[in-house]
Amino acid sequence: MIIRLSAAALTVASAFPAMALAAGTDQPTVTVTATRQAQRADEAIADTTVIDRESIERAGPSFSLPELLARQPGIQMSSNGGPGKATDISIRGTNSKHTLFLVDGMRLGSATLGTAAWQDIPLSQIERIEIVRGPASALYGADAIGGVIQVITKKGSGEPKINAFVGAGSYGTREVSAGVAGGTEQLSYSARGGYSQTESFSAQNRKLSTYNADNDLYRNGNFSGNFAWRPAAGHELGGSVLYAESRSMYDSGRSYNNYNNAAQSAWNLYSRNRFTDIWTSTVRFGQSIDDYENFASYAPNGATIKTTQNQFMWQHDVRLPIGSLLAAYENLHQKATNEGTFDVSRSVNSFLLGWTAGIGAHKLQLNARHDDNSQYGGKTTGYAGYGYQILPTLRIQGSVGSAFRAPTFNELYYPGFGNPDLKAENAYNKEIGLLWEQGGHNLSATYYRNRISNLIANDQNFIPRNVANAKLEGVTLGYGGQLAGFDLTASLDFLDPKDADTGKRLQRRANKFANLSISRRIQALTLGVEWRGSGDRYDRANEIRPLGGYGVLNAYAKYALNQEWAVEGRMNNLLDKQYETAYGYNTPGANVFFGVRYAPK
């Protein structure tokens, strides 16, 4: 399904510098994540969503990245409390370890937990977000069973401009950010810094024995930067960096105020060179770090857990008489340190090939990849997709693909509870979709079946083993367009996420969930409402601890004072709905946020 949130121009180099396109206001939405090569989002065979900067700003600083993702088709979110607390993202019913997170093409996340710190990535530093639902290991390797979410940081172009934002709201929430961006034909640059803080509320409630009634503060300081230098036509050198440092309080009883300090960072440098009219080479290398320090009653001086990922990629894009060829080599070195517990590492060497083509009414995509992991050996994955334009307004498309997840370092080596003999989890997915677009309206329907085997689960002695299986089957329906002067987007998901061995529903997955957004621009004023609904869930495996369904209504407004200044406001959870996404953990009640933005056009 394609939800095109904007037709504004996108600078493709932001995700994969090899794929730069000239900016222009008449360009359609572009994605690179679906194929690792630039293409129109509405022509992607993979189930793809692109969230542009306008939509991110509309979400407002009172929204987090996980909350924004949860408003997209096929995605569910659960959180252990309010802002900055541990958050899980599920795509099409897969678990949180089955989503690969990229920042400007670089992997970012914890190799000990197997998940990303979604809650710590600030929206103020993001230019756009690309979401690919379905298996993507044939493009990106391990962990892309449910899909890939890629964050693209802010870039610069045109005359140098300063931009800034300041805002405040409920729960003692406040945010400030500022940046500068600009560029010429030879050089482009951007830099932005920000800080946010909230007094928040108690992460837990009385259902849990570790409940503490105090507010669990969260704060986040962040920075991003980007540059690109073009010394000659067809040649470009550049890089980007994202850094976010946070502190989050959490409940662990009344006798101690526990908190953790975390830092997420990702940087990369690249060289893109068009050697001939048909051949472009891109070399990129960089590093990401997930650094976590916990201060608790059992560790008053702090306990550090750190993941470092060094990454190298050499990609070749070759234009063929029919279609385009992709060939690449990657090297990934992962090192994880759990203070006083283990200090381990592994390396992965990967080779991949891909071919995409449009032949008349036919669209094709083929990908194959082999990953050789020093810990568990080799894995080969593949993807085949086909689309056919039945009518100028109607397309049918389908795909099959395999994927896998690598065991985490905790699962492998945690003292007394690790299993170094673990193998990778495997997945095989089939899907088919219909897409209709006419007169500014688009409708889509996607059906998928994903079978995951060799799942890692704990035995009766809490030792992880490859013993479980899952069946995920669902339908995603979507609409985007304009009705009676209102911009409208909507999605509805039906999901059957089962443990294949017990027949029970998987934990924290709803069978039905939906999103609706309606907005209207009246001269300088933009008004909108949003609604997100979810069916019931179970907090634990084997359908233990039921969680009720819920619906949350939000409203927002923006008024442009002139070409440079605007005032913004949001009212979240208007009806003050009390609900939980995880048993015993609170969610925000009714709250407001107002801000002033300076952004010269």
Q: What do these predicted regions represent?
A:
Residues 66-106, 127:
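Extracytoplasmic beta-strand/coil segments of soluble accessory domains associated
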Residues 186-189, 199, 234-237, 275-283, ...:
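Repeated loop/turn-to-beta-strand initiation elements of outer-membrane beta-barrel proteins
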Residues 28-60, 88, 96:
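N-terminal periplasmic "start-of-domain" segments of outer-membrane beta-barrel proteins
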Residues 255-274, 305-310, 374-377, 389, ...:
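Outer-membrane beta-barrel signature, preferentially recognizing the C-terminal barrel domain
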Residues 137-138, 150, 157-159, 165-167, ...:
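Periplasmic-side early beta-strands and strand-to-turn transitions of outer-membrane beta-barrels
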Residues 212-334, 443:
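Outer-membrane beta-barrel domain signature, strongest for Gram-negative TonB-dependent receptors
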Residues 322, 358-363, 449-451, 466-541, ...:
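Gram-negative outer-membrane beta-barrel transporters
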Residues 106-133:
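Short acidic/polar hinge/loop motifs at secondary-structure boundaries
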